[in-house]
A protein has these predicted regions:
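Transmembrane-helix bundle of Major Facilitator Superfamily
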Residues: 2-200
Length: 200
């Protein structure tokens, strides 16, 4: 009696991977550019607000504890919801959650510039952190699912560099924007960044 062996179908594995890639733009380097722009947006807002705080205090009569909450509400929401953001990406689709995070982050940024009250700024900074927590885990997951193993380390290195550079560049960019425009501009700058991430 002949014994039949079942060979693993490599095409089925490729087809399983295809839906992830099909939702992303064809070239993986464009995909990396898009998610890196999203990472830059989140990193900038972690550090840029420190430069804007004196102007915020002057314009909105914010106290020192208020200014601390403007910084901390964002960081707390971002850090505490990263795992939730990753699980949501697994359930709903990484690209979808990434785009939701980018768009929500930009809308919250505009709201911060327009709201005109300290409590409103604190609340919207927390909302910024929520949307940042949605997009951040999806960026790395998208990179991992897009690049083949031989290019993955390079891609992750670029992704990590984008995060580090954005945090370091925040005070520099914030100083330029606050000096030449207004404190609101450090949040409005997220809108063109978000547009670039969505278009790519």
């Amino acid at each position: 009696m002949a014994i039949s062996t079942v060979q693993p179908d490599r095409r089925s594995a490729a087809n399983h991977r295809a839906p992830v890639l099909a939702g992303l733009r064809g070239n993986p380097w464009w995909t990396l550019a898009a998610v890196s722009v999203g990472v830059i947006m989140v990193g900038l807002d972690a550090s840029v607000v420190a430069i804007a705080n004196p102007r915020i205090a002057a314009d909105l009569s914010a106290s020192l504890p208020d200014l601390q909450w403007i910084t901390d509400s964002y960081l707390l929401a971002l850090a505490s919801l990263l795992i939730f953001g990753g699980k949501l990406g697994d359930m709903l689709g990484r690209k979808r959650v990434f785009l939701l995070g980018v768009i929500g982050f930009a809308v919250a940024s505009v709201g911060i510039g327009l709201i005109g009250t300290v409590s409103g700024v604190i609340a919207l900074r927390a909302i910024q952190g929520v949307f940042g927590a949605l997009l951040m885990p999806s960026t790395l997951a998208i990179v991992r699912s897009t690049f083949p193993p031989e290019r993955l380390n390079t891609a992750i290195g670029i992704w990590g560099a984008a995060s580090g550079v954005s945090v370091a560049a925040g005070p520099i960019l914030g100083g330029i924007l606050v000096e030449h425009y207004s404190w609101e501009s450090v949040f409005y700058i997220n809108v063109p960044i978000a547009v670039i991430a969505v278009v790519l």
